[in-house]
Swiss-Prot record:
One of its GO terms (cellular component) is photoreceptor inner segment. Ca(2+) 3 binds at D158, N160, D162, Q164, E169. The keyword Acyltransferase does not apply. Ca(2+) 1 binds at D69, N71, D73, T75, E80. Stimulates two retinal guanylyl cyclases (GCs) GUCY2D and GUCY2F when free calcium ions concentration is low, and inhibits GUCY2D and GUCY2F when free calcium ions concentration is elevated. This Ca(2+)-sensitive regulation of GCs is a key event in recovery of the dark state of rod photoreceptors following light exposure. May be involved in cone photoreceptor response and recovery of response in bright light. GO terms for molecular function: calcium ion binding; calcium sensitive guanylate cyclase activator activity. This is Guanylyl cyclase-activating protein 2. It is found in: Cell membrane; Photoreceptor inner segment; Cell projection, Cilium, Photoreceptor outer segment. One of its GO terms (biological process) is regulation of signal transduction. Ca(2+) 2 binds at D105, D107, N109, C111, E116. The lineage of its organism: Eukaryota, Metazoa, Chordata, Craniata, Vertebrata.
């Protein structure tokens, strides 16, 4: 990217929402202070959001990075960054679910298979355990295993029984069933995670 942020370009790419021009210019200034090249690589993304250097956090954040990286070039530019923030922080429930779907859809083929779902559920379980979340529930034997969560989600959401979750099945299944909504977001949904990490970061 160049050293000037274009308000018109941001509008064309859907990066603007409730943020005004002055706020976006300030974000861009701070973004370039942290990333002079104008793009974030994976290691910079982790530093940007103050991600702990452990396996549990890394797995989840790498999935988050892929969702930010809309063009698949393994970097995040400012427009991708702001567009994602506006979507997950200010978007509708449907928008947030669609974005969460992108995190699960590791190979970007438009469907989520059992292994993709299991990988994310396992990484979030590990991250929550590392943060001592729901330890008491697990000790009491009330917490489902990742495999049990995946089996139940597919039973409730995979309407055509093809072993994959389409975007429509994912969104409608979450809307239809509160348990599915909770499990797909795992109480660690992208919106709340990003909000927490942004508060930890001095960037915004």
């Amino acid at each position: 990217m160049g050293q000037q942020f274009s308000w018109e370009e941001a509008e064309e790419n859907g990066a603007v929402g409730a943020a005004d021009a002055a706020q976006l210019q300030e974000w861009y200034k701070k973004f370039l202070e942290e990333c002079p090249s104008g793009t974030l690589f994976m290691h910079e993304f982790k530093r940007f959001f103050k991600v702990p250097d452990n396996e549990e956090a890394t797995q989840y954040v790498e999935a988050m990075f892929r969702a930010f990286d809309t063009n698949g070039d393994n970097t995040i530019d400012f427009l991708e960054y702001v567009a994602a923030l506006n979507l997950v922080l200010r978007g509708t429930l449907e928008h947030k679910l669609k974005w969460t779907f992108k995190i699960y859809d590791k190979d970007r083929n438009g469907c989520i298979d059992r292994q993709e779902l299991l990988d994310i559920v396992e990484s979030i379980y590990k991250l929550k355990k590392a943060c001592s979340v729901e330890v008491e529930a697990e000790q009491q034997g009330k917490l489902l295993t990742p495999e049990e969560v995946v089996d139940r989600i597919f039973l409730l959401v995979d309407e055509n029984g093809d072993g994959q979750l389409s975007l429509n099945e994912f969104v409608e299944g979450a809307r239809r069933d509160k348990w599915v909504m909770k499990m797909l977001q795992m109480d660690l949904n992208p919106s709340s995670w990003i909000s927490q990490q942004r508060r930890k970061s001095a960037m915004f």
